[in-house]
Amino acid sequence: MKDLKDLVRPNVWNLKPYSSARDEFHGDASVFLDANENPWNMPYNRYPDPLQWKLKDRLAVLKGVDRSSIFLGNGSDEAIDLVIRAFCEPGLDSVVTISPSYGMYEVAANVNNVECRKVSLDENFDLDAEAVLESADEWTKVIFLCSPNNPSGNSLDRGSIYKILKNYEGIVVIDEAYIDFSAYPSFLKELSGFPNLIVLQTLSKAWGAAGIRLGMAFASPEIIGVLNKIKYPYNVNQLTQEKALELLNDEATMKHQVNEILTERNRLEKILSEPPFSYQVYPSDANFLLVNVAKADAMYNGLVKKGIVVRNRSNVQKCRGCLRITIGTPKENDSLLNAMKNMKL
């Protein structure tokens, strides 16, 4: 890895971050007259903890990392945007992504006027490490890898990921939004060995908390320090912090629901790949299946008319004819299967 100072934008490296009232005070107090808040207990009259320490303490235990290696944001999308803003000079630097994959990497790059170079996965949605490395040049600051990948659902080859980590001198972001559904381990344990690694996770999938918008970035304390420098002061609100802590203290419920989803995923994969459907169902390590139904537009519109919404991915590279189907409850999945079975295309 290059020296971090050589990767971070010079203006960001030299930036004196905004210091909030809650940043400047450390200790216990009963009277707070420092932040121009309403003094009456509403009960959310006070600004939230800008660095979310209680939440990070719980995550540190769950994830086996030091709290100084945790960044929390308003969904993982905030972390994606901050990584690009921290490392990429607009109009000069570039990022590399794989295709097809999660679309926000490209959107965030475009918003920040940063070139986004896309490297195609093969027909089985496997990663070509050499092609990714060849796509990067001296102006490439970040490589984004989503594993398990969205919309394909498969985990990327770990050997290929290691090859990129070992041979690329910039930042490598591994988006693990779906890792709780995967049979493969997280890359969190690799943080100490790869100072250029950032791992993204979320509460939106396995933890069932998409509505509270909490994303996590794990990296070296030095990288986390850079992200904290440019984030908005109170980027995670008090309600989100409280609900997230409540959820994280009930890991048993999450694991039970994940097991139910995996059972249903296997059931749907088997049914949809056999007669009378006989669709091509791609292997999945996520909470969804990518299914080639051939007449995707007609199937999608037919399901919508029956009140069932899936994601039509037919216009995405290498996904022609494909629907992405989120695994629902057994009742929801049965409704889907019955609707598809009786569909006249």
UniProtKB/Swiss-Prot annotation:
GO biological process, one term: L-histidine biosynthetic process
Signal peptide: none
Gene Ontology MF terms: histidinol-phosphate transaminase activity; pyridoxal phosphate binding
A Pfam family hit: Aminotran_1_2
SUPFAM superfamilies per record: PLP-dependent transferases
Top-rank taxon: Bacteria
EC number, as in UniProt: 2.6.1.9
Family: Belongs to the class-II pyridoxal-phosphate-dependent aminotransferase family. Histidinol-phosphate aminotransferase subfamily.
Protein name: Histidinol-phosphate aminotransferase
Source species: Parabacteroides distasonis (strain ATCC 8503 / DSM 20701 / CIP 104284 / JCM 5825 / NCTC 11152)
